[in-house]
Design a protein with these regions (language model features):
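Binding/recognition "hotspot" determinant
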Residues: 1-59
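Alpha-helical transmembrane segments and their helix-start/interface "positive-inside/aromatic belt" motifs
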Residues: 1-11, 81-101, 204-215, 270
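Alpha-helical membrane-interface segments at transmembrane helix boundaries
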Residues: 45-53, 85-89, 93, 142-146, ...
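Alpha-helical transmembrane segments
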Residues: 192-209, 273-279
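Hydrophobic transmembrane alpha-helix segments characteristic of membrane transport
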Residues: 59-95, 187-201
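Loop-to-transmembrane-helix entry motif
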Residues: 48-55, 91-95, 172, 182, ...
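Hydrophobic alpha-helical transmembrane segments
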Residues: 54-66, 158, 163, 181
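Non-cytosolic segments of integral membrane proteins
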Residues: 95-187, 221, 225-278
Length: 281
């Protein structure tokens, strides 16, 4: 419901956009890929994964032969029981990884999702704290005359634009995490087939590290939201009321946008943060 003041309504509209995206993130971060958007996307990914298993098995043989050729200097060395047994075990394990890659990936995601749920429960938050305009600021804006309100229009438009852009960047980053999960899960038979050969196994190791980082991004995102919620519970203080109304609003909006930038930056860099902290880079 409008307040009857265009400036207040414009700021409230931007904050409603921000609060809505935060609530959506809080819900998305606890959603599994299987139930995301009704599970329709997941069904397509499962079909693609099944189709790529044939390619994975073909690469399995190729990587195995390449590994045997590079690690064994001659056919005589290959005839040694310990060498042949080692190659056989590697091939069997790689074949199992290709066959059960989907189960391995979903299992790893469930572990990470359990960590996210634990962080949410430990924080004591059932939902994100909404960011609202203080009553004092609303009173200052409503008491401004028409001529003096002209600078406020510019400040309000600029601040609202920043808040809208930050909201979109934040939610797009969270959605991109789901897309990365889907892409990694779809192609999992191909990189896991590289474990059949010792020289090519670095491909599989790099893939597993990347997938672990994608799963653990949720922990960083939820921690950033919890920290911001604590900031939101103590909104920026209103500056000296003897200042011009435009200055008071600009100081408030500037501090509010700074807090939002911290959250968006943490969410945007969640992949980099988790790679640096866990050594997954």
């Amino acid at each position: 419901m409008g307040s009857g003041n265009w400036i207040v309504d414009n700021l409230n509209s931007a904050l409603e956009m921000w609060n809505g995206r935060l609530a959506e993130i809080w819900q998305l971060i606890s959603t599994s890929p299987e139930s995301f958007k009704g599970g329709g996307v997941w069904n397509v990914i499962v079909n693609i994964n099944d189709g790529l298993k044939a390619v994975g098995y073909a690469l399995l043989v190729l990587f195995f032969v390449m590994g045997v050729v590079k690690t064994c200097g001659s056919f005589t060395e290959m005839k040694k029981p310990e060498v042949a047994f080692k190659c056989f075990i590697r091939f069997v394990l790689a074949q199992a990884a290709v066959s059960w890659g989907m189960e391995l990936m979903t299992g790893a995601f469930r572990v990470a999702q359990g960590m996210v749920t634990t962080i949410m429960d430990s924080s004591g938050l059932t939902a994100m704290s909404a960011t609202t305009l203080p009553d004092e600021l609303v009173s200052v804006i409503k008491d401004v005359g028409f001529i003096d309100s002209i600078p406020l229009w510019a400040v309000t438009l600029l601040g609202s634009l920043f808040i809208w852009v930050l909201s979109l960047v934040m939610i797009l980053t969270v959605y991109s995490r789901f897309f990365k999960l889907y892409i990694a899960t779809a192609i999992v038979p191909i990189p896991l087939a590289s474990f059949a050969g010792q020289p090519s196994s670095s491909i599989g190791v790099a893939f597993l590290k990347s997938y672990a980082a994608i799963c653990l991004e949720g922990c960083v995102i939820v921690l950033a939201c919890v920290i911001f919620s604590a900031f939101a519970s103590s909104p920026p203080a209103i500056a000296d009321d003897t200042l011009a109304a435009a200055t008071i609003v600009w100081n408030y909006v500037g501090e509010l946008i700074f807090n939002m930038l911290v959250l968006v930056g943490a969410i945007k860099m969640s992949d980099r943060i988790i790679r640096e902290l866990m050594g997954l880079g």
